[in-house]
Design a protein with these regions (language model features):
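Phosphodiester-processing cores and adjacent nucleic acid-binding clamps
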Residues: 1-208
């Protein structure tokens, strides 16, 4: 059993061509491990949310509905360069019904307004629909990790401050360790940025 740990960064079969977890098996395995809650954060979609919620209710586990959204490097309307086709990852988790409504709106607008290779949101939308949401900095494909991998520590501090302006105390820096060299390289810098900005840390697994 794993007590005191909750998976907050989890992909299912609805992360198409990426996730291998089946929702039923995912929830039942979490229960077997003695976990009281589990999140679902598929890439850019919320297709599995209802099945996930119902399965969690059936198994007596708290369902944390979320999404790993794609954030446009510039704005969601910029669709002309290769960089626009490489959006940053960002994990959003619903705190309450308002958060669920706002996340649903963000995911919808990612498709209807921001789609360019991927459904993309931008900072303007995040500011508009931030209420009721918890934000995690995501994996090595997140903007914070990419900034640190580029060696831009000062820019990383500025970035975290910008996200804290949007999400306040509901913004967390993710720490992951899967034996990937890039993760190990930026880990001390993530800790430094967290200390310098007073940002809380959260340990996650990028579960697929």
């Amino acid at each position: 059993k794993v007590s005191g740990f909750v998976h907050l960064h989890v992909h299912s079969e609805y992360s198409l061509l990426d996730g291998a977890c089946r929702i039923r098996g995912l929830v039942r395995r979490a229960k077997e491990m003695g976990q009281t809650a589990v999140a679902l954060t598929d890439h850019g979609v919320m297709y599995g949310s209802i099945d996930f919620y119902n399965e969690c209710v059936e198994n007596g586990i708290k369902a944390i509905i979320g999404c790993e959204v794609y954030v446009a490097p510039r704005t969601r309307f910029d669709k002309s360069t290769k960089s626009d086709m490489k959006p940053h990852h960002l994990v959003l988790l619903c705190k309450d019904n308002e958060g669920y409504k706002n996340l649903s709106k963000l995911v919808t607008l990612g498709y209807t307004e921001g789609f360019y290779n991927k459904p993309r949101v931008d900072r303007e939308l995040l500011r508009r629909y931030s209420k009721g949401l918890i934000c995690l900095s995501a994996c090595i494909s997140g903007e914070l990790a990419r900034t640190l991998l580029d060696g831009r520590l000062a820019d990383a501090v500025t970035l975290v401050k910008e996200y804290r302006e949007i999400f306040g105390e509901d913004y967390y820096i993710e720490l992951q360790s899967h034996g990937i060299s890039e993760q190990e390289r930026i880990l001390p810098y993530l800790l430094r940025v967290a200390k310098d900005t007073g940002t809380q840390l959260v340990a996650t697994n990028d579960a697929h």
